[in-house]
């Protein structure tokens, strides 16, 4: 019943109101375009700020190697070559 009523109303409507005034569509398109540009700029600015904050916080801490110290002895010891007695 309801789909039949909706179909009947759609058939009786002569023309959509938005299609009658194309200038209004152009104005709304321009507003939407500017809105998209503003949102894109704000998003990029936010990403750059977050990245800079992450870099500075990483530089403040010692990073992955906190608590590790260098060994006092060398990894490879040198071999002493001695000639056999004759």
UniProtKB/Swiss-Prot annotation:
Cellular component GO terms, alphabetical: cell surface; external side of plasma membrane; Fc-epsilon receptor I complex; Fc-gamma receptor III complex; ficolin-1-rich granule membrane; plasma membrane; tertiary granule membrane
Assembly: IgE Fc receptor is a tetramer of an alpha chain, a beta chain, and two disulfide-linked gamma chains. Associates with FCGR1A; forms a functional signaling complex. The signaling subunit of immunoglobulin gamma (IgG) Fc receptor complex. As a homodimer or a heterodimer of CD247 and FCER1G, associates with the ligand binding subunit FCGR3A to form a functional receptor complex. Associated with CLEC6A. Interacts with CLEC4E. Interacts (via ITAM domain) with SYK (via SH2 domains); activates SYK, enabling integrin-mediated activation of neutrophils and macrophages.
Role this protein plays: Adapter protein containing an immunoreceptor tyrosine-based activation motif (ITAM) that transduces activation signals from various immunoreceptors. As a component of the high-affinity immunoglobulin E (IgE) receptor, mediates allergic inflammatory signaling in mast cells. As a constitutive component of interleukin-3 receptor complex, selectively mediates interleukin 4/IL4 production by basophils, priming T-cells toward effector T-helper 2 subset. Associates with pattern recognition receptors CLEC4D and CLEC4E to form a functional signaling complex in myeloid cells.
Entry-annotated residues carrying Phosphotyrosine: 65, 76
This protein's name: High affinity immunoglobulin epsilon receptor subunit gamma
All residue ranges annotated as the ITAM domain in the record: 54-82
Pfam families xrefs: ITAM, TCR_zetazeta
Keyword field: Cell membrane, Disulfide bond, IgE-binding protein, Immunity, Innate immunity, Membrane, Phosphoprotein, Receptor, Signal, Transmembrane, Transmembrane helix
Entry annotated with the keyword RNA-binding: no
InterPro entries xrefs: CD3_zeta/IgE_Fc_rcpt_gamma, FCER1G, Phos_immunorcpt_sig_ITAM
Organism from which the protein derives: Homo sapiens
Cleaved signal peptide residues: 1-18
Location(s) in or outside the cell: Cell membrane
Membrane association type: Single-pass type I membrane protein
Family: Belongs to the CD3Z/FCER1G family.
Record PTM Phosphoserine, positions in chain: 69
UniProt keyword annotation of Membrane present: yes
